[in-house]
Structures are given as C-alpha cells and as structure tokens.
Regions:
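Structural and coupling elements of P-loop NTPases
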Residues: 1-245
Length: 245
C-alpha cells in the first residue's frame, strides 16, 4: 500500500518471486500498480493470478489485457512481460491453467510457483541477516524477522547487530530461532542461508540493522526507503498575537 511504502520495499527484498492477485471483475486496482512497480524494479518476475473467476460479472480476457498494459506502462522487461497466468477462485479453493477449470484444488498454483521462480540466491561466508520487520512478543521480547543472507544460525549463538553505517549497535545471544511454516512460526534448531526466520534475544537492534556473526564488519546494504507521502512541521507560535486569538 502507498501509505506503507517502506515496509513494502523491505518485504519484497526478502522474496524470490511474487504472485500478483487480480480480481477477475474489477481488474488492477491503484495499490496493484504501486506494489507491482516495486516488484518489477527489483527484478522479480511475477505470476499473474486472476482470482474470483466465479463472479457472474467476471471479464478475465479484458483483465489480462489490462494487466499486460500495466506491466508495459511500468517499463517491465521482456522477461517480466512474459508472465504466466493462472485462474481460479480462492473462495472455492481451486486454481487452474484455464478459467474453466478443472476445479480441483490449489496444486496447479503451487506447481507453477516451483516451476517459475528461481531458488534462493545465497552467499558464502558467516551468518548475516538484514532485519526487515520487528515486533514485541510478551514471551520472547523483541522479535526480529529477516532473510538469512549467508551462513547459518542456531539458538544460543553469539551475534552482534550492525547499523547501516557499520557501527555496532549491540552484542548478544540468540534465544530462539523461529521458521515460517505456512501461517505459523515454529522453533527450529538451525536456519541456513535463504531461509526467512524470526529471532529473539536482542534488545536494541531494529529495522535495517544487520544481525551477523561476531567476525563480520560490513553491514548488508539496506534498501532506500521512499519519503513519506505527507510531511508536516509543527512549531511554537511566537507571533505578536500568540495566545490572544
């Protein structure tokens, strides 16, 4: 969403691909353009999913043309313009290569994801992870989520946090490593490069900091964040009529 541009950019930089969900009747929405522009800019090759194909007012042919025009207007590359299309109804629980079905589960979408997206690109070296989001948990404390760029991480491992300028923010030990399994987070013994994980144990590190092995001195370059949609400045009224209006 345009109101959360920074968060959108950080999330997109964790993924290897994207599924662009478009309503079969309404077509691309304003927020579709915003998020798609970000995805194309960093080189992602989206899968286009035409959803709600069961609506009586669906117009999938026109919507596909609108999506193609949107890609072209956003300066998509030839490879990005050659996007695969899948149709279906999330409400009814099916996806298929054809708008007419077969209406037999979500497997075609999952198969397309495996086929179309490249595996995670990993780097050699000790553990490094760029913090993408933070949250507070009543049991775990500060929870940092990000993608492991290189190396591996285990619970009770010593790490440090580097700010974007390379200064050490804090040093500590990881108390818990959580991996994502569907919509749930489950504790794991170890996470490796390419995994998206959540960790706890640090108290000061924040978004755009690099969590890394103690031997690392260079932080991961953080994605520039869009300026606010609206900015406001407040100052004390020190005019001659202050307090007299």
């Amino acid at each position: 969403h345009a109101d959360f541009g920074g968060e959108v950019e950080r999330i997109l930089n964790m993924v290897d691909g994207a599924v662009l969900l478009v309503d079969a009747a309404e077509g691309p929405m304003p927020q579709t353009k915003f998020v798609l522009q970000k995805a194309l800019k960093i080189g992602l090759r989206p899968i286009v999913c035409i959803n709600k194909i069961d609506r009586p007012d669906e117009r999938h042919n026109e919507v596909v043309n609108e999506v193609f025009d949107l890609f072209a207007n956003l300066d998509a590359s030839e490879e990005q313009l050659d996007f695969p299309i899948i149709y279906g109804s999330a409400k009814q629980g099916w996806m298929a290569d054809s708008p007419t079905g077969p209406q037999d589960g979500m497997a075609p979408l999952f198969d397309l994801v495996v086929k179309h997206f490249n595996p995670p690109v990993v780097e050699d070296g000790p553990f490094r992870m760029l913090v993408t989001t933070i949250e507070s948990n009543p049991f775990l404390g500060r929870v940092l989520t990000g993608r492991v760029r290189s190396g591996a991480i285990k619970a009770n491992q010593s790490v440090k946090a580097l700010a974007r300028d390379g200064k050490t923010v804090e040093q500590g030990r990881i108390s818990k490593v959580l991996a994502f399994r569907g919509l749930e987070r489950v504790p794991v013994d170890e996470a490796e490069a390419g995994d998206i994980i959540a960790i706890s144990g640090l108290t000061t590190a924040t978004v755009a900091d690099t969590i890394c092995d103690s031997s690392v001195s260079e932080p991961i370059a953080a994605q520039p964040i869009d300026p606010p949609t609206l900015t406001m400045t407040f100052r004390i009224n020190d005019g001659p009529l202050a307090g007299k209006e």
